[in-house]
Amino acid sequence: MDAEKATDKTNVHLSSDHERCPVEEVALVVPETDDPSLPVMTFRAWFLGLTSCVLLIFLNTFFTYRTQPLTISAILMQIAVLPIGKFMARTLPTTSHNLLGWSFSLNPGPFNIKEHVIITIFANCGVAYGGGDAYSIGAITVMKAYYKQSLSFICGLFIVLTTQILGYGWAGILRRYLVDPVDMWWPSNLAQVSLFRALHEKENKSKGLTRMKFFLVALGASFIYYALPGYLFPILTFFSWVCWAWPNSITAQQVGSGYHGLGVGAFTLDWAGISAYHGSPLVAPWSSILNVGVGFIMFIYIIVPVCYWKFNTFDARKFPIFSNQLFTTSGQKYDTTKILTPQFDLDIGAYNNYGKLYLSPLFALSIGSGFARFTATLTHVALFNGRDIWKQTWSAVNTTKLDIHGKLMQSYKKVPEWWFYILLAGSVAMSLLMSFVWKESVQLPWWGMLFAFALAFIVTLPIGVIQATTNQQPGYDIIGQFIIGYILPGKPIANLIFKIYGRISTVHALSFLADLKLGHYMKIPPRCMYTAQLVGTVVAGVVNLGVAWWMLESIQDICDIEGDHPNSPWTCPKYRVTFDASVIWGLIGPRRLFGPGGMYRNLVWLFLIGAVLPVPVWALSKIFPNKKWIPLINIPVISYGFAGMPPATPTNIASWLVTGTIFNYFVFNYHKRWWQKYNYVLSAALDAGTAFMGVLLFFALQNAGHDLKWWGTEVDHCPLASCPTAPGIKAKGCPVF
C-alpha cells in the first residue's frame, strides 16, 4: 500500500480530543494515524539502509581527521534514498520467494514511509552521535597518533563495539522512562517527522507552497549559499567588525573577535556555524533557548570579563582569553612529551622540572561550569522528575497514561527487556576481558571498568530527562575524567578509556533513545527498530574502525601540527581537544590542578553550588504552583550556556540563540500556521543543502588543492585577539608589555 494513501485505507486510527498529545509542538507536527499493514523490513530497506550506513560512516570518519572537519548528517541519505527507493519499487520483480519456510518479495509494493524511516535509522548509525563517528575512535586516535602507542586492531574493535552496544543496552532498559512517557518528547525528532511527511504525504491545496516545494526551494538556496562561507567568502563564518574598527587594540580584538575572543558584536552567516555545537536552533524549545541564553550572557559578558580584566583570576592575562591550548607559566605551549615515560605514565621528576600546566581563563571557567552542571542535573531531575520516575519504577508500564501515539503503538509486539540485558551482559563481559588481555594498552583495571559502568547507569536517566524535554544534553565528561584522574593519577590512557565507558556509552544510549522515540512517532514496530539499530551499530563500528585504522597507518604525520608538514590538511583539531583532556585529567591529574595547592582548586566549589541552585527554583514552584513559568527555569540548561567552549566559540552560541529566538518565539507565537507547516522542514533543508555543498566543495576543489587566498578567506581579521596582556609575556605576533 502506498504510504501516500495510507490514511484512506485499513487500520487507520484517529484520536479524539482527550487522546491528543499534550505537548503542543508534537500535536502540531506528528501524524495521529497509522497503517499497520505497511511493510517495513523489506529488501529495499535492508539494501538502502546498510548502503547508507556504510557510506556515511566512511565519509564522516574520513572528514573528521581534516583540518576543516565536516559532519555529514543522515538527512543527506534520507533525501537521496527517496528517488532510489521509488525506482526500485518500479523496477524490481514482484515475485514471492520462499526460503526455509519464510516467504518474501524483493518488491512488496510502493516505497513507503516506514521503509524510509528504517533506512534513516540505519543511516543514523553511520553518523553516530554528534561527531560523525564513534567517540571511541577519538581515544584510539589519541593512543596511536599522539601517544604513539602500539595498539592491536582486535583491541580497538573491542573498544568500539563494546561502548556502542553498552549504550544500546542502557537504552533498552530506560525505554519506559525516556520513550513511553508523553512528556519525554525529544524535540529534535520533530524535524525528521516533518521532513518524512513532506516527502511522502500529498497535501490538500492551500495558500502558499506545499511543504515539499518549500523544502526543495530552501534546499536549493542553502546549497547555493553555502558556497560563500564554505569556499568563496569564509569570513562570513566569523564576521567580527569590531576588529576592523580597532585594528591595533588588543582589548578591542579580545572583546570583538568571533574566533579567538568573546565575540561581542560578531555574528555568523553560516548555517554550519550556527548549528555546529547545539544542533539546529529551529528544533529547540523556546524555554530551552531562553535558559541557554541566560547562562551564556552571565558567563561571556559578566563572569569571564570580570575574572580576566578585574581580578586576573588564574593568572589569566598571561594567556589568550580564549584558547583550548595548554600553557607553561611563561605563556608558552606546553610540551607533554617532556613529562611522559615510555609506558605513557607521568614522569614526576620531569614534571617538577618542567613546571605546572596552565589553561586559558575561558577554558578553565568552562571546566568549572561542567562541575556545576553535573550536580545541578542530578538535583534538578531528583526534585522535578523524581516522583514520576519512582512511580514508573514501582508500577506496571501498562498503567502509564498514554496519548494517541502510545495507544497506536500497542498494535505491535514490544521488545522483551531480556534482549537488551543480553546485549548489556555481553558488552560488559567483553570489556572486562579486554581489561585483562590488553592490560598494558588500556591501563584501566577491571574494577575501573565496573566503576565506569556504574557511573553511566547513574547518570544516563537524569541526563536523558533533560535532553528529552529541552533538546540540550548536559555533558559530564569532565566528572568522569575528574573522578578516575584522582583514583588513577598519571595514566592518560586509562583516563580516556574510562571516559568512553563511563560517559560515551551514555551518549550512545541517548542517541539510540532518540531514534526509538522517532520510531514511536512514525509507528515503526519496536522489533524492527531493535534489528535495524543493532545491525547498523555493528556494521558502522567495524567500518568506522577500519577506515580510521587505514588512515592512521597510511597518512604520514597525521594529526601532527608541529611536524614537517605544518600545512597538512590532516591536523585533527577535534582529536586535539581529546588529547588535551587526557593530559589535564589523566597525565597531570586533577589533584595537581584542582586539589589543595592547585591553581584551579576554587573551581571545585562549583560542585556544591550546582547541587544547591535547583532547590530554590523547585521550592518557588511549590509555593507558587500557578506560576507556570517558574518550573521552566532549568539550572542544568542555564549552565549549558557555557558548554562546549572551546572548541565552540561565543559567536556560534550567540548566533544560535538569535536564530532560535526568531523562529521559536516570534514566528511560533505570531505566525503559528507558518511555523507548523514549514519550521522543521526549513531546518532539515538547511542541514541537507549545507551538507551536499560541503561534500561537493571538498571533492571538487579543496581535496585537489584549489584553495582561494584573499581578504575574504581570512578567519576574522583579529590577529591580536590571542595575545596575552601580562607584563613580560612573549607570544608570536604580539607586543610585549
Swiss-Prot record:
Tissue: Strong expression in flowers, leaves and roots. Preferentially expressed in the vascular tissues of seedlings and mature plants as well as in pollen and developing embryos.
InterPro entries: Oligpept_transpt, OPT
Main location: membrane
Pfam families in UniProt: OPT
One GO cellular component, as annotated: plasmodesma
Record-level Gene Ontology MF annotations: oligopeptide transmembrane transporter activity; transition metal ion transmembrane transporter activity
UniProt subcellular location: Membrane
Membrane topology, from the record: Multi-pass membrane protein
A GO biological process held by the record: xylem-to-phloem iron transport
Keyword NADP: no
Induction text: Highly induced by iron, copper and manganese deficiencies.
Regions crossing the membrane: 45-65, 69-89, 117-137, 153-173, 215-235, 255-275, 289-309, 357-377, 418-438, 446-466, 478-498, 532-552, 604-624, 629-649, 650-670, 681-701
Keywords from the UniProt entry: Developmental protein, Membrane, Peptide transport, Protein transport, Transmembrane, Transmembrane helix, Transport
Similarity comment: Belongs to the oligopeptide OPT transporter (TC 2.A.67.1) family.
Function (record text): May be involved in the translocation of tetra- and pentapeptides across the cellular membrane in an energy-dependent manner. Also acts as a metal transporter that could be a component of the copper transport machinery. Essential for early embryo development.
Protein name: Oligopeptide transporter 3
Organism: Arabidopsis thaliana (Mouse-ear cress)
Lineage, highest ranks first: Eukaryota, Viridiplantae, Streptophyta, Embryophyta, Tracheophyta
